[in-house]
Amino acid sequence: MAAGFRTNVWDPVLIISQIIAIQCTFYISLGVWVLIVDYWSGSIHSLDQFFAYKELDISSLKGKLLMIAFCLNSLTGAMALWFIVKRAKQCLDFTTTAHIVHLVFCCIYAGFPFSWTWWLLNIICLALMAVIGEFVCMKTELKAIKVSAGSSGKNSV
């Protein structure tokens, strides 16, 4: 195989570690945003806010603030993609994986989410995280690469 620019090498350890890092960042940042929402709304802290679809109630202030926390978490997740994955081509893959793992955790914790609000919110958050992550990664990938012209001066042969 000829050497080329950014050759792809199958590295399952790297991929799994990136998935774990993105998932941890996803839940840590969601925890921070939910903590801020709880402070504003005066709610008690609960895992239900992460995993129970019934908490995402559009008619209550608490539910609306929780939805905002999920959307803000998408922005934080996009920055995590930029920092951890660094490839625009892989942002959708890692974002989808994070949200599918979140769906599995929600199903284990509170059962299958039958609320259209939960599905709509998670699809919007997935799209936000993927698109913004791809944008910031692409801006980094498209930066000019500085190439030195070589040595000049007295020590040249």
Swiss-Prot record:
One of its GO terms (biological process) is Golgi to endosome transport. It is found in: Golgi apparatus membrane. InterPro entries: Integral_membrane_SYS1 (IPR016973), Integral_membrane_SYS1-rel (IPR019185). Its main location: Golgi. The keyword Ribosomal protein does not apply. The chain crosses the membrane at residues 19-39, 65-85, 91-111, 112-132. The keyword Lyase does not apply. Keywords: Golgi apparatus, Membrane, Protein transport, Transmembrane, Transmembrane helix, Transport. Pfam families: SYS1 (PF09801). It is a multi-pass membrane protein. GO terms for cellular component: cytosol; Golgi membrane; trans-Golgi network. Belongs to the SYS1 family. PANTHER family: PROTEIN SYS1 HOMOLOG, SYS1. Involved in protein trafficking. This is Protein SYS1 homolog. It comes from Nematostella vectensis (Starlet sea anemone).
